[in-house]
Curated annotation (Swiss-Prot):
Subcellular location, principal: cytoplasm
EC number: 3.4.24.-
PANTHER family documented for this protein: INSULIN-DEGRADING ENZYME-RELATED, NARDILYSIN
Keyword annotations: Cytoplasm, Hydrolase, Meiosis, Metal-binding, Metalloprotease, Protease, Zinc
GO molecular function terms listed in the Swiss-Prot or TrEMBL record: metal ion binding; metalloendopeptidase activity
Protein name: Putative zinc protease mug138
Role, per record: Has a role in meiosis.
Active site annotation, chain numbering: E71
Biological process according to GO: meiotic cell cycle; mitochondrial protein processing; peptide catabolic process; proteolysis involved in protein catabolic process
Species, as recorded: Schizosaccharomyces pombe (strain 972 / ATCC 24843) (Fission yeast)
Amino acid sequence: MDGKPQVEVIVNGQVVPNLDDREYRLIKLENDLEVLLVRDPETDNASAAIDVHIGSQSNPRELLGLAHFCEHLLFMGTKKYPDENEYRKYLESHNGISNAYTASNNTNYYFEVSHDALYGALDRFAQFFIDPLFLEECKDREIRAVDSEHCKNLQSDSWRFWRLYSVLSNPKSVFSKFNTGNIETLGDVPKELGLDVRQELLKFYDKYYSANIMKLVIIGREPLDVLQDWAAELFSPIKNKAVPIPKFPDPPYTDNEVRKICYVKPVKNLRRLDIVFPIPGQYHKYKCRPAEYVCHLLGHEGEGSYLAYLKSLGLATSLIAFNVSITEDADIIVVSTFLTEEGLTDYQRVIKILFEYIRLLDQTNAHKFLFEETRIMSEAQFKTRQKTPAYQYAHVVASKLQREYPRDKVLYYSSVLTEFDPKGIQEVVESLRPNNFFAILAAHSIEKGLDNKEKFYGIDYGLEDLDSQFIDSLLHIKTSSELYLPLANEFIPWSLEVEKQPVTTKLKVPNLVRNDKFVRLWHKKDDTFWVPKANVFINFISPIARRSPKVSVSTTLYTRLIEDALGEYSYPASLAGLSFSLSPSTRGIILCISGFTDKLHVLLEKVVAMMRDLKVHPQRFEILKNRLEQELKDYDALEAYHRSNHVLTWLSEPHSWSNAELREAIKDVQVGDMSDFISDLLKQNFLESLVHGNYTEEDAKNLIESAQKLIDPKPVFASQLSRKRAIIVPEGGNYIYKTVVPNKEEKNSAIMYNLQISQLDDERSGALTRLARQIMKEPTFSILRTKEQLGYIVFTLVRQVTPFINLNIFVQSERSSTYLESRIRALLDQFKSEFLEMSDEDFSKHKSSLINFMLEKHTNLKEESSMYWLRICDGFYDFTRLEKQAEIVSTITKDEFYSFFINNIHYEGENTKKISVHVVSQRCEDEVYEIPNVTIIENGNMFKESMTLSKAAFPLKPFDEIDRSLLFN
């Protein structure tokens, strides 16, 4: 014996995707902690995650939110590392991030860090599960943080719907409990009961945080033996308390909770019908996953489906069907249908049609064939799965380890269906009975009967029994001939082959393979990931794009009409790993198609042909126009971040339209206008395109040529090709634009503090801006969020508003927006003094961390494609921008950086160009702080017109001067 902690090797290796070149070893430490070690010699970042098999369902009823509070306070220092910011500072100085979440049955903690800093991060991470301090002085602050997190969800319909599922459940069930926690449940209630919340938290931690119900994943470059030694050394001290995994015998729904309908008025302007079925637990049925299979059929959107029939009748626009595991013994299936006005009026007919389809499922003998298609695609997706960022992989796999999968096939069985289980499928279908569901009907027009109020979200709702005669009619329903099971899926790929060739010199950027008056085509044959997939982007650039608000909403409506017309055709493609999206751009319409190359060309040609041949059906037009009008109205209920983001874009770009302008414009868009509009939009087009993946240059040319021929446009003159420009904020400019939140129930205000720095082609300023964000992000978070408790959402980011690079600070809070701006100014004052005191070592660490981030390799094809397309769309075509800026960062001195900060970021800087967007809650309008030397923007359009426009974004080099020798590493 050498004194090392004992380790049991459970299994070497895992069944993995074809392209997964990592090494795996599953071990168990002497304290019963199961650890999956993953060696990835190519990873830039290392990671670890611990999943604890305890979540919100284990909260004591007198301390709701305690598990979530534990997740928060756990990070506030340990005996070995008592500084509450030590962990975060270590990660930030090594290009790291961390996060955690509390779910109903588990709590998951994870981090990512530069590969060479893994041991130090593991040491700090392990201490949270060995000897956390749960500092008394942090207690109240973190209760407020939990409360702030809850407050940000108060006006979220998704959170409110989920809470209603709980409210309508069996009151004896753990599912009925409020999970998040707030200042009442963690502050006021414990005081009233004479409870010390910190002492109760210590009891909770001591009772449940045991090594035997934890799962750990470690990903690093080091050999497995080294990772194993680190795991044993650092994590064996976690105590094993032999804790049993909690069981929850009370069912979430009994006969008392079904056959009811709940009426609720949502925050957003939506019309939604949720049908919820309690079903037997599916936890142990991972080989077939019967409920998942049944949801696949209920949520199908192809020919003969429930949704297709509803759409043909003008009753619905979309739906989603899903199952949720509530406890080990109980699941629910939810069919959530988004209704038209007619569907809302006749919602009982919608329910009847659902039960017609369920009857079809009950009578069919085709499940084996349909299941086999699903199984084939799950296998294909698993075999061709690419890597994801290390932290994403670690925390997902850690939660999967909690399941009872065979230990050498944890990754496989969590992804692939393997066994057809007709009895299991029938058991689920038989649970979808007319006497075994409850409904939630939500719409803005619902006013009467909302005589119940939910305590924690303030949801007003009504509840009544479903009519017994209606239930009886569902028991004797017959299936319409319009409903039938899915046909054979023509998009299932036959070939998953990739001709993998040795590559000595990898392509660094895409190659320009066609550039004429009709098409500019960039192509890169994948030489890194070797998957049988591709990503294709086409920007159909039109001279009339964004010409007016009416053109803008008409373009959006046109893309929606195409997607709607192709819904039944394209849905099977999505099941077979092929997806497309159409979205309006500042210059036209962008088509993105991604997936297996075997059938990608078929979908591409179908979509482009529909763009050309679309026949606008008046009923579908009115339904989709109404839906878009609802979305524009829902801007009033938009989260503060998205609202401020939209306003900043509108203020910055000459052809960006305000929500009010778009709302007014859509009123004038009529079905009779669309034919001429489509003709005008497509008459002159230039196709800017990128093909990246498992396609040769010849394949790429043929793909884009087919799109061009289908549209057959006239060329766009060079003078008609608009390029991106933005307003120039004058040096020394200090502007505030205020927008009041119309929703009177919204407690939160917010500020987007935006600093316009330089044009994107100014590489040195870009490097300095990124370094500023690197240095500022941790102190901004720890000061504004942790210490000052301004709000749950606090971040800094580098933002691109072409052609400019910007630095943003965002805070959402229950305090007023002027107070938030005053605290950001105080923060900048603090930075000003602290930068002078920063050691050379700390400055060097920040530079190294940023350089590591900027030089990170892409982890999958999508990441790489998205970066190329972003560089194409910004108009500079600078595919190596980050690499060049990384070189510049290495040369930046403290003096240069300090001068840059003082002149360009501090609010008194002579070159500082600042616009802050204030999103103002009506609940805190009275709290006003004076901001000196500021100009209030009273009228956004007049402000834009008074500003000088930037020069347009142009390629760094003329296209005919691109040197092919520079394309390679």
